[in-house]
Amino acid sequence: ECWEDWDLIVNQLAKQEPFHKPGTAQGYHAMTFGFLLGEIIRRVDGRSVGTFFREEIADVFDIDFKIGIRENEFERCAEMIMQKAPINVINFARRIPRWLLPSRIRMIGDTLSSAEYRKAFIEILRSEDQIKNVTAFPNTPQWRKAEIPAANGHGSARGVAKFFSILSNGGSRNGQKLLNKETIDLATTEFSTGPDKVLFQGPYKFGLGYMLDAPLSPIGLENTMFGHTGIGGAAGFGDKVNKIGFAFVNNKQHGIGKLYRTANNLTKSLYKSL
């Protein structure tokens, strides 16, 4: 019930000490990154991140994407069908000596039980009821109305692809400027690389807010890509060399074995057509 209490969340974040010494490790900020940047926007501009995005970006460039939605917009939202936690895999991993496990299962088991993963994905749930009902939580009014910049944006594939297309074509569209080209170049420069202590120890590469290489996903299939993956198989990216934007969004999460398979196939077909 606290997701709509922005002040509570950012005040708790301000009190939080770094989980490891800055510069010594990479750990994906599944939730906190959006609140950190959103609070900077609010303090500089006065508007919430959702209002700022709507008035300065979505409305100006006709991008079908929102951060925090109103109740009269719920009818446009597809119900999320969440993938249940792989309990059988986890229980199997706990019973078998670690050295006998296949490397993929060992990696998953290590990550799901790690302190970094739990802090990023589990301990943010404030009650046992939320943990038990995590698969239904994204469909609740509280989640949809809250402004959670790193996690609960709502939009269409066309909207996400258009956003990345603008960035991939110099940052302007129809005489309106979204970002300077120099800013885009800086944001898509590599600043951090894995192994990521939250994301399965994978060799993820990040710019400023953008993934530059994300194992198993489309991002990184070409070294000219920048974008971000989504939990359950979604992905959006831009390509400044080929001047394209792409997005695949799904309301039913894909399981671990099929994760990003559809997005990868679509991406490969896209690049074959260029």
Report residues per predicted region:
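Conserved tyrosine-mediated DNA breakage-rejoining catalytic core shared by Y-recombinases
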Residues: 64
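Catalytic-loop motifs flanking and including active-site residues across diverse enzymes
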Residues: 29-36, 156-160
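Short hydrophobic "helix-edge" motifs at membrane interfaces and signal-peptide entry regions
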Residues: 36-37, 146
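Short Gly/charged-rich anion-binding patches and loops
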Residues: 8, 36, 53
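Active-site-proximal loop and beta-strand segments within enzyme catalytic domains
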Residues: 1-31, 39, 45
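Catalytic loop of the DD-peptidase/beta-lactamase superfamily, centered on the K-T-G motif
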Residues: 25, 42-60, 68, 72-274
